[in-house]
A protein has these predicted regions:
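Cytochrome P450 heme-thiolate monooxygenase catalytic core
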Residues: 162-329
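Conserved cytochrome P450 K-helix E-x-x-R motif and the immediately C-terminal K′/meander segment
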Residues: 65-75, 358-403, 407-423, 464-465
Length: 540
């Protein structure tokens, strides 16, 4: 895919940069030695003039290495910090990271005019060029409430009705995808797992956000999936070039990587039709109302300044990107963990069978506590993001310990490093499926799950029980007032994907030792080419 081509060439550039870096280090070391041994003098003026720029070049190359080594650089800096705030240099700015909840809460409490989530997101996604000229303000006021109310109240409340339809669609989708894989022996088929998961998340989200018609439109779904990839490519290129080139280059790239435009045009037609349907209902025509995010956003649109078609489409595209991107990579990592720990699979199958999908639907997807704990432990050890609570500094900001951050830089927390801290987590580097399960729930599960014993599967420490959607000890969903309001839907959708896969199919990795992830900046992505063996179960 085009992303692989881009990353391959970026890797070649990094190799060339590495060679330059070695030469730069050697020369800057010479400069350091001159200054240390002789100090500045007239005799050294020539060397200072020649070599001083190389010190700057060395720093820039080190910052560029963050592109492909971001998580490792953050981890190394975290281990040296002893709990204090620490900083890492990136090609565009400095990131100041914190790793304790006191300072994380200080980030959350800061005014949005000082530390801005939207300004950081705008820098990452370049929405003016990737999302059809969507202009974000650095500070969102009350006009952002329609989307928040839609996701937190309307979508979460509709889950008991929505989840059975999503599961039905996904069962059909997985069967179709299985048929397209190459058969290797006796009904066993082989293929790449990530495209399957990405397609499942896209279809699920399209149903919830846009309604069943667009969710079953292959052309729309293809554009929606490509839009994720194209957004990342365009935004990353624009972040790497001087701002004076961003407008012409952004137009050039978006005209060629045009899946965002295809998606925008389809959503514009759909939202426009919804407005016409509303007018017709006012005139007495019997046109049924839809139950999806388009309709609910229209319901909650500000009365004093109603959102029009363009604003609604832009909001839908933004939430589409975030939800598909994060959920697909998270679900894929969980599947990798199931393949690494096949002893967990039968336990989770029995939990799904004992609980039943009907009870799951009625709960809005908020039960299956064993699977919930498995998903949380998977995300703890294999997060797809190294940072959270990401904010761009708009005004000088100081933490309570005196650490100052200047405008243009970012402040973030470091959850990936924090989640492996042995001072916080017992057996921090080990995968324990029941780490987040309450003891009484595990004790009850032993009454209906065969092979489940406290000797074989233990809770490594008391007091860590919590659900996947909790925020008290967890940063996957963001922090405090800026946390993800769609997390109840996302959690339920991932449970359906995992539950359907393990109850209907046997799955294992073709090469369990092959590399599965690569990093770019702070993100960690699964390789799209990782192969699985997949076979339909007899009782499915």
């Amino acid at each position: 895919m085009f992303t692989a081509w881009v990353l391959n060439h970026l890797a070649q550039a990094a190799l060339l940069g590495g060679s330059c870096m070695l030469a730069t280090i050697a020369l800057s070391t010479l400069l350091d030695a001159v200054l240390k041994n002789n100090g500045p003098s007239k005799g050294n003026d020539f060397l200072l003039v020649i070599l001083s720029p190389l010190v700057y070049l060395k720093a820039r190359i080190k910052a560029l290495s963050f592109l492909v080594q971001g998580p490792a650089i953050i981890q190394a800096a975290y281990e040296k910090s002893n709990g204090a705030p620490f900083s890492v240099a990136t090609p565009s700015n400095t990131i100041v990271l914190v790793s304790d909840w006191k300072r994380i809460k200080e980030i959350d409490a800061a005014p949005e005019g000082t530390l801005s989530l939207l300004a950081a997101a705008k820098e990452v996604l370049q929405p003016k060029h990737t999302m059809s000229d969507f202009t974000w303000n650095d500070k969102r006021g009350s006009d952002g409430a329609p989307l928040q109310m839609t996701l937190r109240s309307r979508l979460a409340g509709y889950l008991p009705s929505l989840l059975p339809r999503i599961r039905q669609d996904l069962c059909a989708l997985f069967d179709q995808r299985l048929d397209t894989l190459a058969e290797v022996a006796n009904g066993v088929r082989q293929g790449a797992i990530f495209p399957i998961i990405l397609g499942a998340v896209a279809q699920s989200n399209a149903h919830a956000f846009f309604g069943p018609e667009l969710a079953r439109d292959p052309k729309f779904l293809t554009a929606g999936i490509k839009m994720i990839e194209h957004t990342l490519i365009i935004a990353e290129i624009l972040r790497m070039v001087p701002s004076v080139f961003s407008t012409p280059l952004g137009k050039f790239l978006s005209d060629r990587l045009d899946s965002g435009k295809v998606m925008t045009e389809a959503l514009t037609r759909e939202v426009s039709q919804r407005f016409r349907d509303r007018e017709l209902r006012k005139e007495g025509h019997e046109i049924p109302e839809q139950n999806d995010c388009i309709e609910w956003i229209m319901d909650h649109s500000p009365r004093h300044k109603p959102w029009g078609v363009t604003r609604i489409v832009h909001e839908l595209i933004a939430v589409w990107f975030g939800s598909v991107h994060i959920a697909s990579t998270t679900a894929c990592a969980a599947i990798f963990d199931l393949c690494d720990h096949p002893e967990f699979v039968d336990i989770l199958r029995q939990e799904v069978s004992h609980t039943g999908w009907e009870a799951f639907d009625k709960s809005g997807g908020q039960i299956l506590p064993l699977m919930d704990s498995f998903m949380k432990e998977s995300a703890r050890l294999n997060p797809i993001e190294s940072v959270s609570s990401r904010r761009k500094v708009l005004r000088p900001f100081g933490f309570s310990d005196g650490t100052m951050v200047q405008p243009g830089d970012w402040v973030c927390s470091a959850p990936r490093a924090m989640n492996r801290n042995p001072n916080t987590w017992s057996k921090a580097d080990e995968f324990h499926i029941f780490r987040f399960v309450k003891p009484e729930i595990l004790q009850h599960a032993q009454t209906y799950i065969e092979g489940l014993s406290s000797e074989k599967f233990m809770i490594p420490e008391a007091g860590k029980s919590s659900s996947y959607t909790d925020l008290t000890d967890w940063q996957q969903w963001g922090t405090g007032k800026a946390s993800c309001t769609g997390r109840w839907y996302a959690s339920a959708a991932i449970k359906i994907i995992l539950g359907v896969l393990i109850t209907r199919y046997d799955i294992k990795l073709v090469n369990p030792t092959a590399k599965r992830y690569f990093s770019w900046r702070t993100f960690i992505y699964p390789y799209q080419s990782t192969q699985i063996l997949m076979k339909q179960r007899n009782n499915s």
